[in-house]
């Protein structure tokens, strides 16, 4: 995190995040804010949420807006390595709001997880990727077919709901 007393060198920041210093936009702004806050702050925000600390939803909202790589990685690290089921569930729940299009293949891993709650949050990831416009129905199709075949009735129910929303309205 930068010292609040120091002015921001916007040109250096643009170079740091790989952006043309003469261009702007929401995606560039999110990367710049993430860079100013730092990866460690993003990882700590994930931990804050997973631990259920006060204002956890505030941390989630900031992470949802920024969708930083460090938060996505930390969510997956907790999901893959933490022995506590509740922490794994919360990590996947949070991953749902920070996931991006390139994370779509992870939906298959989540649906294949032996934990029914992780499977259901995997459907939440797919749902969010669809409705936030990160992926389209064609991209989601293999995972919808996978969900349809899962023995978990809640996953199949979520599959049915997603299919209904994806059908063209007449």
Identify what each model region corresponds to.
Residues 4-11, 35-48, 68-80, 100-112, ...:
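Amphipathic alpha-helical scaffolding segments comprising HEAT/armadillo-like alpha-solenoid repeats
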Residues 2-3, 15-36, 47-68, 86-100, ...:
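Structural detector for internal amphipathic alpha-helices that build alpha-solenoid repeat scaffolds
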Residues 52, 83-84, 114-115, 151-152:
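Short inter-helical turns and helix N-cap capping residues of alpha-solenoid HEAT/ARM repeat scaffolds
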């Amino acid at each position: 995190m930068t010292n609040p007393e120091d002015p921001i060198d916007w040109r250096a920041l643009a170079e740091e995040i790989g952006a043309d210093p003469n261009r702007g936009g929401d995606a560039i702004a999110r990367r710049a804010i993430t860079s100013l806050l730092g990866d460690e702050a993003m990882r700590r925000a994930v931990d804050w949420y997973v631990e259920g600390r006060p204002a956890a939803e505030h941390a989630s909202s900031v992470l949802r807006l920024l969708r930083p790589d460090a938060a996505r990685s930390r969510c997956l690290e907790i999901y893959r390595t933490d022995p506590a089921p509740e922490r794994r569930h919360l990590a996947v729940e949070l991953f749902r709001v920070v996931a991006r299009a390139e994370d779509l293949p992870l939906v298959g891993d989540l649906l294949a997880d032996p934990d029914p709650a992780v499977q259901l949050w995997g459907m939440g990831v797919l749902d969010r990727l669809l409705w936030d416009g990160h992926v389209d129905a064609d991209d989601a199709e293999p995972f919808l077919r996978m969900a349809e075949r899962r023995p978990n009735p809640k996953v199949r129910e979520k599959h049915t709901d997603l299919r209904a929303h994806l059908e063209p309205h007449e």
